[in-house]
């Protein structure tokens, strides 16, 4: 069984056509996940305008104990699902490489453009969603010094001189 988590109906239609050999289920919100029915599924997550990280959605996915998770994202988030095997792929992956990845064959899937820790991605998502510093500190339960350290590291990783350049960053749509 394949669970396709996306808000993009064209993406889902494409996945359904590619994965025609199996049972393909479209999931748009966490209430649609049935922990018993979808147990041990193969999960494919599209994060474009659908940032499911750091939400109850990801907790629900972890409870499913999926066989494998493929995440379409320019960000590689270290240990985002604990011990669940996760592969991050860009949306520009070829169909041949994607099918090889689904079948468990070796394929030369390019690495994600940016590699972040869970906490760095969480801080980056909060900044992209225009939360104030105080709200971020309260939500993430971190100190001001830790926040500035994460912010500085993120700016170095993304090659930003000022944090307000983030709104024009090529991957901003994957954070909201």
UniProtKB/Swiss-Prot annotation:
One of its GO terms (biological process) is cellular stress response to acidic pH. Residues 109-174 form the HTH luxR-type domain. CDD domains: LuxR_C_like. Keywords: DNA-binding, Transcription, Transcription regulation. SMART domains: HTH_LUXR. Disulfide bonds: none annotated. Pfam families: GerE (PF00196). Residues 133-152 bind DNA. Gene3D superfamilies: Winged helix-like DNA-binding domain superfamily/Winged helix DNA-binding domain. InterPro entries: Sig_transdc_resp-reg_C-effctor (IPR016032), Tscrpt_reg_LuxR_C (IPR000792), WH-like_DNA-bd_sf (IPR036388). One of its GO terms (molecular function) is DNA binding. Induction: By acidic conditions. Could be induced by EvgA via the induction of YdeO. Overexpression causes filamentous biofilm formation. May act as a transcriptional regulator of dctA. This is HTH-type transcriptional regulator DctR. The lineage of its organism: Bacteria, Pseudomonadati, Pseudomonadota, Gammaproteobacteria, Enterobacterales.
């Amino acid at each position: 069984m394949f669970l396709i988590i996306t808000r993009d109906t064209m993406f889902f239609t494409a996945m359904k056509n590619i994965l025609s050999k199996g049972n393909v289920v479209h999931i748009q919100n966490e209430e649609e996940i049935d922990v018993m029915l979808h147990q041990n599924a193969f999960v494919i997550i599209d994060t474009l305008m659908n940032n499911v990280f750091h939400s109850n959605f990801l907790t629900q996915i972890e409870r499913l104990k999926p066989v494998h998770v493929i995440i379409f994202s320019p960000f590689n988030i270290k240990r985002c699902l604990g011990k669940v095997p996760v592969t991050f792929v860009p949306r520009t992956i070829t169909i041949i490489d994607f099918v090889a990845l689904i079948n468990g064959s070796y394929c030369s899937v390019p690495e994600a453009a940016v590699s972040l820790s869970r906490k760095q991605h969480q801080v980056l998502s909060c900044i992209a969603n225009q939360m104030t510093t105080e709200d971020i500190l309260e939500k993430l339960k971190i100190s001001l010094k830790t926040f500035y350290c994460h912010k500085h590291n993120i700016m170095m990783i993304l090659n930003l001189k000022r944090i307000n350049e983030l709104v024009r960053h090529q991957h901003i749509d994957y954070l909201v």
